[in-house]
């Protein structure tokens, strides 16, 4: 539906994997020591991406209905772990949950269109494939993470996919 969500938003996952992740977060909350959960978006990084492979195979996701893509570069994933560990070691409090995504939730079609242009794959040559069944089609907000003092090296998919 494209609505925005953050760590305070209600979570009612329909998929098995989403339900399993929520159950794991509940176990983390029960842990008697300091702990937090990190909800990573779609992780990508160096090397060939699944999206580029899909484009090279002649397929692009449908333009409609728009499916929101929340991504995070693998380098930023590691940096988030280090940031939160340093906060803990410095005696600073941690929130119970962080959304770890970049600052630009974007319709997947736009991401794939940008990647096709970057990789010189003519859009006219692409056929619409199946819609993505992943994720909940929400715009995940990373304000809690940024408010903790973290700064993204790759604030959007454009910086992340350009650094290849």
Locate predicted features.
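Active-site "gating" loop of Rossmann-like NAD(P)-dependent oxidoreductase/epimerase domains
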Residues: 1-15
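Conserved catalytic Lys-bearing alpha helix of Rossmann-like short-chain dehydrogenase/reductases
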Residues: 16-28, 74
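Substrate-positioning beta->alpha
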Residues: 19, 37, 43, 48-53, ...
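Conserved beta-loop-beta element that borders a ligand/cofactor-binding pocket
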Residues: 24-46
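A short C-terminal helix-loop "cap" of Rossmann-like NAD(P)-dependent dehydrogenase/epimerase domains
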Residues: 52-64, 121-125
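Non-catalytic, hydrophobic alpha-helical segments
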Residues: 77, 81, 100, 111, ...
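Mid/C-terminal beta-alpha module of Rossmann-like enzyme folds, strongest
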Residues: 80-83, 87-131
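C-terminal amphipathic/interface module of NAD(P)-dependent oxidoreductases
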Residues: 133-164
């Amino acid at each position: 539906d494209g609505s925005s969500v953050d760590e305070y938003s209600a979570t009612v996952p329909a998929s098995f994997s989403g339900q399993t992740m929520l159950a794991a977060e509940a176990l983390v909350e029960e842990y008697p020591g300091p702990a937090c959960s990190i909800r990573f978006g779609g992780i990508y990084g160096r090397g060939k991406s699944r999206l580029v492979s899909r484009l090279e195979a002649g397929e692009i996701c449908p333009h409609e209905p728009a499916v929101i893509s929340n991504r995070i570069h693998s380098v930023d994933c590691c940096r988030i772990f280090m940031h939160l560990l340093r906060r803990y070691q410095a005696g600073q409090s941690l929130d119970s949950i962080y959304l770890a995504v970049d600052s630009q939730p974007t319709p997947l079609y736009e991401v794939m269109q940008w990647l096709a242009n970057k990789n010189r794959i003519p859009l006219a040559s692409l056929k619409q494939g199946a819609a993505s069944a992943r994720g909940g089609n929400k715009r995940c907000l990373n304000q809690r993470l940024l408010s903790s003092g973290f700064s993204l090296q790759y604030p959007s998919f454009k910086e992340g996919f350009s650094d290849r």
